Amino acid sequence: MTHDYQLNPTAPLVFRSGKPFGSSSQDGSRFPWPSAIAGALRTAWMRDQGDVNFQRAQESLELAAAGPFLVGPEDCLYVPKPADALVLRDEDAKDTTKALQIHRMRPGKFADGCGSTLPQGLCPVVVPTDPVVKPQNTASFWRLDQLLAWDSGQPFPAAQLESIAEPAPFRHRQISTHVQIDRKSGTSKEGQLFQIEGLDFGRARNIDSNGFSAGFSSEQWALGARFSAPLDDGLIHLGGERRGVWLQSGVNHLFAMPPALAQAVSTAPGVALTFCTPALFSQGWKPGWLDNALCGEFPGISGLRLRLIACALERWQGISGWDLARQQPKPARKAVAAGSTYWFEILERPTDAQWPQALWLASLSDATQDRRDGWGTVIPRIAQDTDFSLCTQG
């Protein structure tokens, strides 16, 4: 059984890669890795069991987590911008509200005389129109309901495509400066300054036209996660500096799969899977459970056999962290970035009619432990029949 939780930060949260903060490194606080959420929830579970010395740490690794997910003030989920969405600005548009145009990239075919080194059977991802301008920077997270509506043919809200629509935690970062303390003398070490940058999920301060404070915004952001064990509501720690978050249960509505989407996926010839969290594969971008023909059974869903036909990838991400059990850094690994989209043709379907719900927020990663840690969580999206017919005609 899966339990859904909302995590409400009480202070800016610090997540980092291990590099020093500062303008020289350009390595500020970032959205947390799945392992950070999994570790926090497993620690909370052990404490709920009365294990304050982490004697059940190995047992806790068998508990599955999914997340993190960004929860917006509208009480809905936000997901990373999908890699198959190309946003362009029409400089000649008379109506500035319609200057930004979103184009859907799809599996297709090369033009005559063109080719590539793509693996046999993998189609290129193409843009229906020939863009003459550069892609635009947009918000890094989009509302899930708006994304799914766009998949079904509805227009995407133009205001949400602007970079100013970036969720508040990424715009309102808190930077604090600290000094290193000499443990022997109890005084600061001269010249030893360092900074900590955190993501601020709290209500931002409003500033009026004169530059004075005008109260606080009503927007409150949070994180969401799923866990395979029940947890007590209360304060837990998450990320660096032991920052606190309030763990709240009873938020199942946030993670429910829309019934219309489940029905569409159940009868579709194929499905597009977009990563909500980075994915870890043994063969780089290619899932290890696929054979040389790019076919394989989806991990954890017996009877669901798929064939990969195309993928739209963001730049790979370097993943590392701290191993609490071994007290040493974890080996660095390359991950497929969140937002990347894979198109699969459905070859065989499970006999269980509820299989689309099992696909919702499931993990696509290769290793069992990586899936338990929440790496490679996906949302299924509606794909057009033409996305697959062009690639299956030979």
Language-model regions, residue ranges each:
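Conserved active-site/ligand-binding neighborhood in enzyme cores
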Residues: 1-394
